[in-house]
UniProtKB/Swiss-Prot annotation:
Globin domain ranges (all copies): 3-147
Family: Belongs to the globin family.
Gene name of the encoded protein: HBE1
Organism this protein belongs to: Saimiri boliviensis boliviensis (Bolivian squirrel monkey)
The keyword Iron is annotated on this UniProt entry: yes
Protein's name in the database: Hemoglobin subunit epsilon
UniProt subunit comment: Heterotetramer of two alpha chains and two epsilon chains in early embryonic hemoglobin Gower-2; two zeta chains and two epsilon chains in early embryonic hemoglobin Gower-1.
Pfam families: Globin
Tissues with expression: Red blood cells.
Length: 147
């Protein structure tokens, strides 16, 4: 289990409270699909993913991205119990969707990039360290069913 200090929790929740989940969610998932094109195979029912502009403008990408970021919100509310928080999603992604758990780590890294672009100077190295710790812990929790 990952332990978050009070300072780390404060850094994470402070930025999260300013996050536009709908906008950033579509941006994060869209970036994942553009930068790591092999991840597109999990979204073949999303329609046109033929180019970066098609992906970033795709309403299904935006909607699912919002859903993904809403789950990150659950992580923030339950930082001390991520394994339980993501147990059902881990099972779904492992047993039904057969998603490579490495993709969770990639999405976490994309999330950090999105945060950096949205918050600039406010995204200090200390804040980044807290977020890296969170996205890594979320990736581990989502991959738990695979072990």
């Amino acid at each position: 289990m990952v332990h978050f200090t009070a300072e780390e929790k404060a850094a994470i929740t402070s930025l999260w409270s300013k996050m536009n989940v709908e906008e950033a969610g579509g941006e994060a998932l869209g970036r994942l699909l553009v930068v790591y094109p092999w991840t597109q195979r999990f979204f073949d029912n999303f329609g046109n993913l033929s180019s970066p502009s098609a992906i970033l403008g795709n309403p299904k990408v935006k909607a699912h991205g919002k859903k993904v970021l809403t789950s990150f919100g659950d992580a923030i509310k339950n930082m001390d119990n991520l394994k339980t928080t993501f147990a059902k999603l881990s099972e779904l992604h492992c047993d039904k969707l057969h998603v490579d758990p490495e993709n969770f780590r990639l999405l976490g890294n994309v999330m950090v990039i999105i945060l950096a672009t949205h918050f600039g100077k406010e995204f200090t190295p200390e804040v980044q360290a807290a977020w890296q710790k969170l996205v890594s812990a979320v990736a581990i929790a989502l991959g738990h069913k695979y072990h």
